[in-house]
Amino acid sequence: MVPEYSRFYNILGYNFKDCTLLIRALTHRSKTKKNYERLEFLGDSVLSFVIAEVLYKQFTDLAEGKLSQLRSKLVKGTTLAQLASSLKMDEYIILGASEQGGHKREKILEDVFEAVIGAIYLDSDFATVKKVILKWYQPIISSINLDTIKVKDSKSKLQEILLQNALSLPEYSIETIDGKDHEQQFTVVAVSKDLNLRVKAQGTSRKKAEQKTAEKMIEMLSQQGLHEKK
């Protein structure tokens, strides 16, 4: 165990065998090319599956749309940033000179949270990282009140509208990324092949841009008479 990380290991509830994985998971691209971005990509997928599985098993009467809505709530940026802060990840993030002061930024915390999950997965196995994730999420999952889950995020709402009308889901892609690291603007394009629609919007993160793109597509569908069925 690397001494300076012993406290962090205790907070995470996991001891890394290969500490270089953890260091990379904590390193922002403003510091070096060997940063957390690839681990973030991996961790995002691992987290999404673990949460989907636990919700599927715990809420056996929920329809697919409600499960998707609930998962979106649990893996959204704000939730991940809050969990990262509670695990003191902000105290260990490694930033370059251009990003100093960014330890508390929601986007960076969200990315690091997913990257640490990716690092734990590579350092161990799926069963281990699943156990760690569920420990972190236990207070949130145990406090879920289905009666209070009313507001859908735009991507989930769009998904329900399309599925209810037997239409394929849109494909999201990044068109451009403008600005410096700490003030980037993402332009995302959403394409619905079945409806021959192409919509774009901007946001300060990919996820925010995707949500705005979904909002625009919902408005266009509404004009065509396609609404969410209650």
Curated annotation (Swiss-Prot):
Question: In the record, what terms sit under GO molecular function?
Answer: double-stranded RNA binding; metal ion binding; ribonuclease III activity; rRNA binding
Q: According to the UniProt entry, what is the EC number of this protein?
A: 3.1.26.3
* Keywords (A to Z) from UniProt: Cytoplasm, Endonuclease, Hydrolase, Magnesium, Metal-binding, mRNA processing, Nuclease, RNA-binding, rRNA processing, rRNA-binding, tRNA processing
Question: Which residues does the UniProt record annotate as the domain RNase III?
Answer: 5-125
Q: What is this protein called?
A: Ribonuclease 3
User: PANTHER family from the entry?
Assistant: RIBONUCLEASE 3, RIBONUCLEASE III
**Reactions catalysed:** Endonucleolytic cleavage to 5'-phosphomonoester
Which family is annotated? Belongs to the ribonuclease III family.
Could you describe the subunit structure of this protein? Answer: Homodimer.
Where does this protein reside within or beyond the cell?
Cytoplasm
Question: Entry's SMART domains?
Answer: DSRM, RIBOc
